[in-house]
Design a protein with these regions (language model features):
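Cytosolic regulatory modules rich in charged/polar residues
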Residues: 1-132
Length: 132
């Protein structure tokens, strides 16, 4: 399904890293190294259940500094800011401004991960329309 360019679904990339909550830091970093070339810029790893429902987020900084044997469920922040597939650019821009994040996960109506929007993706869509 294609989404309009000025909605979250049209701005998102489907290139992101997600892991089950029981994954260790060591396992996450190993997978990150394997997948790094295939993934856009990574600021966060997303913690999802077996149906890809978004449970939490771990910053790359927290991941690097954590004990290798810790599980993501011990590190994750459950207060995840997300947008829906059909959210418009103004809502997305407000989220970036209000929460000072570098990427926002995009979820469907069942809270399942669909992709992420990086701030640069928002700018690419909004910049051509500034001053109109």
């Amino acid at each position: 399904m294609t989404h309009p360019e000025r909605e979250a679904g049209g701005m998102m990339t489907t290139s992101y890293l997600s892991f089950p909550p029981s994954t260790t830091v060591k396992e996450t970093l190993e997978k990150f190294r394997q997948e790094a070339a295939n993934v856009d810029l990574v600021y966060y790893v997303y913690v999802t259940d077996d149906e890809e429902r978004l449970l939490g987020v771990v910053t790359l900084r927290d991941l690097i500094l954590a004990d290798q044997d810790k599980k993501l469920e011990e590190l994750m922040d459950e207060r995840v800011i997300s947008v829906k597939l059909d959210d418009k650019e103004d809502t997305i821009a407000e989220h970036f401004a209000k929460y000072a994040v570098t990427a926002i996960p995009v979820v469907d109506e069942n809270e399942r991960m669909q992709g992420t929007i990086m701030f640069k993706n928002l700018l690419e869509v909004v910049a051509p329309h500034l001053g109109q």
